[in-house]
């Protein structure tokens, strides 16, 4: 069961879309961060984050920089990451998956596509 999802994206519109999309998950809290550095602050403040939705192209600390640092933190190893980005370059997809992401969804995406991936990752 998903209780807390951290969405990391520099677009307020995307955060609103996630909020609407994630309303289907009962008792699930959406935590928003505008870049990778802010995401680390949220991870330190919020316990029990179950999933991270991560954009690639962001200011301050991009998604791949975040993933590189994230994978070095033992405390976060159990939190799955789904990359959701307009960055559709094959090398970014491969790099993100090699860095530990559990999935990659290209924007724009269908809600059913993201839902299926979340369900697959959230299922024991």
Where are these regions (language model features)?
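Receiver (REC) domain active-site loop signature in two-component systems and cognate sites
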Residues: 58
């Amino acid at each position: 069961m998903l209780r807390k999802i951290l969405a990391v994206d520099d677009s307020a519109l995307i955060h609103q879309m996630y909020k609407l999309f994630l309303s289907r998950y009962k008792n699930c809290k959406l935590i928003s961060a505008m870049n990778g550095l802010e995401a680390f602050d949220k991870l330190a403040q919020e316990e029990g984050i179950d999933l991270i939705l991560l954009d690639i192209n962001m200011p301050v600390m991009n998604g791949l920089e975040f993933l590189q640092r994230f994978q070095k933190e033992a405390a976060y190893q159990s939190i799955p990451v789904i990359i959701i980005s307009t960055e559709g370059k094959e090398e970014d997809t491969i790099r993100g998956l090699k860095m530990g992401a559990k999935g990659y969804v290209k924007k724009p995406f269908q809600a059913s596509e993201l839902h299926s991936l979340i369900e697959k990752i959230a299922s024991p």
